[in-house]
Amino acid sequence: MNAPLGGIWLWLPLLLTWLTPEVSSSWWYMRATGGASRVMCDNVPGLVSRQRQLCHRHPDVMRAIGLGVAEWTAECQHQFRQHRWNCNTLDRDHSLFGRVLLRSSRESAFVYAISSAGVVFAITRACSQGELRSCSCDPKKKGTAKDSKGTFDWGGCSDNIDYGIKFARAFVDAKERKGKDARALMNLHNNRAGRKAVKRFLKQECKCHGVSGSCTLRTCWLAMADFRKTGDYLWRKYNGAIQVVMNQDGTGFTVANKKFKKPTKNDLVYFENSPDYCIRDRDAGSLGTAGRVCNLTSRGMDSCEVMCCGRGYDTSRVTRMTKCECKFHWCCAVRCQDCLEALDVHTCKAPKSADWASPT
């Protein structure tokens, strides 16, 4: 009897996770609000008291976070552009993504990580651009230092990523820290993985000073890489995400399949398998793939066979304006003609049942 009971206790926290209704990060809705601090803070639904406090105290930081939402959602959509679930957002939903993130899936893990990374990136960039009263360039990067190439002087404006990480942790994690359930711990883990991903690509840039461009003196600073690098890295982590269950005391994770390694702080973790996203499903938050463009010659996730879930596809002939007959003219211009190009566009058929058309 002990073994079955032990199994029940191991899975009980996961069952409780599935029944947890409030898992969305309502601060994501900040991209749809604007204006003065009080107006914005009081009109974002679902913020906890700590988040509202930070919102009122740092209106300039909140504006940076709000602008950053558009950037990280665009990056999410870029990474999922060839998949059945394409990180589509719902403008009228305060959770931004609807019910799809109620499931503790790989997709949820990625969204929490990329959103947390986006906050770090947006705040750090705003610091360096002098847009925030509470921070500026990294104050620790002063004086002389050494690297593999020799001695250099810290100069310019080093990105103050430590401030960005500190504020992001305080603001983004506030709601999850109030929760004691397994999903909150999952979100906190993936939030941290996202923050660490941005810092991973902090790079040292230098400028040489000397006669004829020689490097007699070097001035260096630390700069964040383009956010695409963070997105690409987290995408790889999404593909290698580790399914976990809560341990018996509810303080950490255990791998669901003992053949896999224990997740590190850099890995993404999830509890539930993803739906197939083939049809519109109100409960799963899936919009389905009916009408999605597919690639007839691909063998990947964007292929018509995979994207359309075996339902087949429709083909339509469309024309578009392109540049053609381009010629180089001395000096120094390339001149092209405008030409009409005809091409076939393939879109996924809808399921035969009319149920797919019901609103999400």
UniProtKB/Swiss-Prot annotation:
CDD domains registered for this protein in UniProt: Wnt_Wnt2
GO-annotated molecular function: cytokine activity; frizzled binding
Disulfide bridge positions per record: C76-C87, C127-C135, C137-C157, C206-C220, C208-C215, C278-C309, C294-C304, C308-C348, C324-C339, C326-C336, C331-C332
Domain of life: Eukaryota
GO cellular component, one term: extracellular space
Example GO BP: cell fate commitment
A Pfam family matched in the record: wnt
Family: Belongs to the Wnt family.
Protein's UniProt name: Protein Wnt-2
